[in-house]
C-alpha cells in the first residue's frame, strides 16, 4: 500500500503541475482496520501530518491559493489566445521561446517556488523542474501532448546532476525539449546566440540522449515510470 501511494503521488505530480500548492510531505497515509466475525475491514485515508495543513510554504490559506491560481490562469489564457490559430509546431516553438525569454534560472536554488509553475510564470525564477512543468502546463492548455521527464543530465563541463525536461508529440512522434538548457545563464553583458536557444528543441534520441539520461525514478520509494519512445532523429 505504501509503494502504491508513493507511485500515485509521483504520477500525480508529473501530470498535474497546476496543483503546485500541495506539500506532499505534509500528507500521511492512514490505514485503519476493524475485525469481526465476518472478517477484517480496512479503511484508508489521507490526512494532514502534525503541521495541520497540506499547503506549501508561502501559501497560508485558501485565499492565497485562489489568488495564485487566478494569476496563473490569466497568464495561461493570454498565451493560449496568442497561439490559438497556429499549427502545433508553431504553438510549441512560440511557447518554448516565451519561456526561454521570460524565465531566469534560479542559481541560488533557495526560492520557495523554485520548482513549480508559480515560480516560473509569476516570479520568473526557477530551476529545471519549474521550466519543465511550465512547458507541460502551457502545452496542455493548447492541446499539444507533453510529458515531464526526470533523470540526469551531463553538461558541457562533464558534470552530471539530477535534471528534468520534456517530451512533446508532433505528427505522432515524440521529441525532446530542454527549456532549461536552452536558457543558459550569462555572466556579464553578453547575449545568448539564437542557435543556443534552440540547441535542445525538438531533438530525437540520437542527439538528445548523448547528454540526457531518463531514469523514470521520481522518488526512492516509488516505481520507475516508462516514458514514450523518442523519435530517433530530430524534428524536421
Where do the protein language model's features map onto the residues?
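Conserved active-site-adjacent core of cysteine acyl-enzyme catalytic domains
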Residues: 112-126, 130-137
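Hydrophobic/aromatic-rich core segments of domains that either
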Residues: 130-207
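Short, well-ordered strand-loop elements centered on a beta-strand within folded domains, enriched
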Residues: 42-48, 118-119, 123-125, 173-179
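Alpha-helix capping and helix-loop boundary segments enriched in small/acidic/polar residues
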Residues: 1, 63, 122-126, 150, ...
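Low-complexity, Gly/Ser/Thr/Pro-rich intrinsically disordered linker/tail segments
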Residues: 191-236
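Non-catalytic propeptide/linker segments at domain boundaries
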Residues: 31-69, 75-79
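Intrinsically disordered, low-complexity N-terminal segments that are enriched in acidic
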Residues: 1-49
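Secondary-structure boundary elements
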Residues: 61-120
